[in-house]
Structures are given as structure tokens and as C-alpha cells.
Amino acid sequence: HYMKSKGIHLSLENGVTAIEETNTGLHITLTKGAVNADMLIMAIGVRPDTALAKQAGIALNERGAIIVDAHMKTSAKDVYAVGDAIEITDSITEQKGYIPLAGPANKQGRIAADNICGIASTYPGTQGSSILKIFDMIVASTGINEKTAKRLGLCYDKAYTFSGNHADYYPGAVKMAIKTIFDKTNGKILGAQIVGFEGSDKRCDVFSTAIRAGMTAYDLTKLELCYAPPFGSAKDPINMAGFVIENLLTQKVKQIHWHDVQNLPKDDSI
């Protein structure tokens, strides 16, 4: 609804099959239908530009990213690599992957420089903290998402919370939707995704810190975060996520996910 309110038309699950240049612009053929446009922006992800490394005989993975060790060293003697060109280790799952982000790239550069200068330093891995802004809306993520947790067969669960970015009685309060991925066995926070407005970035950073520190939902309930009505609530959205997960882990409450509703018994027992 937010995107539509801004005049954005979403054509989902509808791929581009052909692009034709015309006298008035572009004619774009889709799987279902077609559109005419002055400009086409293809935002289809990135891939490592490692042709030089390949020519030099440096080991690459199947996606073409340079393989490095924890010291950022490649397979070639005295050659180091960092940034968008390299394969990384996921700090949560310890799986190899490709996450090209500026923050990790800068930290990798410092670690490579340390090792080149004889200072033993290791890179602890990437957890994929990222954020973007769509008009005034903020979409932020850190750690693993449910798709990854499911693919790896992790013993996980998820909790959805909808909390105000600051005290409801203070003007301008809006809700943020938070999805938290956690380990069902011990409550350890594995990932979080947030969609909201002002204040969503701060909460994602708190989740990022919590994940890096190996914190659990129980720890989230105890966090003492800055509070004044213009900035937050006495029970911060982070605390609320912790409370909800704690209630689930201690079986104070049960939750039924939206995708399970169709499988519920039809005898009014629930």
C-alpha cells in the first residue's frame, strides 16, 4: 500500500523477456504484457569482477569470487584481497558466501594491512547488516533470514512484533514491523528484519550488536536503551521482541504462524 501510495506500480513474478529500442524510448516485453519507458534500470545484483585474479591463477570459487583465508590472504604468495571481489564466511552459520558490502570491505582492508605489516589479525566473518530507504520507509536487515535458516536445516523459530518507534502519546509515532529469527533450543538471536520509518535503523543496529555478541532473547529483555518520549518507549521495540520470544521459549504462550492457519482443525477446537 505504501509503494502504491507513492505512484509505484509493482509487477511481481513477471520477468523481462525482451527489450527493444524505439523512436520514443524502450519497449519492454514481459512474461505477462509489456511496458513502454524512457529508461530501464536493471537492478539484478552484482558479481565479482575478478578477471585479473583468474588470469594470475588465483583460486576462485564457483561464483568467481576470490578465495581468501581469515587473514585475507589468497592462494598466491604475498597477495591479499578484500571487498566485493572476495568470498566471505558467514559469521553466524560459518558457511561460505558472497556478501558485497562497504562496511565489511573496510574492515577487511584494515585486517589485510595489519597482516602485510606483520600484525596478526583475523576477520571474524560477515553477518550481512544492510539497510535501504524507499521514500521515507526504511528496510533493514542483519544476520540470517528465514530462507537461509530453513535451507541449512537450523532449529529455529521466528517472532513478529509491531512496536511504535517512540511513545505513542508523543506526536508522530508510527509502527515498525520486526521479524526476529532465533534458535529454538537456547533463544540465541540469529537474524532480524525491520520495515518501518524513523528509528528502524537504530533498532537494526542493536540487533546487529546483539548477534555479534552472541546474545539471546533473554538478554534483549534486559537491555537498557535510551528513552525519552521523542526517541523511544520505556519498553523499547528491542525489549518487546525479547519479551515475545521469551514467552515462547518458556511456553507461556503459543503462536500460530499465518502460513499454518489453513492447516488448523475446522472443528472450532482452536
Roles of regions detected by a PLM:
Residues 23, 27, 34-114, 206, ...:
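FAD-site-proximal beta/loop scaffold in flavoenzymes
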Residues 198-217:
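A short, polar/charged loop-to-alpha-helix boundary motif
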Residues 85-198, 229-233, 237-269:
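Mid-to-C-terminal Rossmann-like scaffold of FAD/NAD(P)H-dependent oxidoreductases
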Residues 9-11, 80, 157-159:
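General small-molecule cofactor/ligand-binding pocket signal
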Residues 18, 71, 179-181:
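Short, surface-exposed charged micro-motifs
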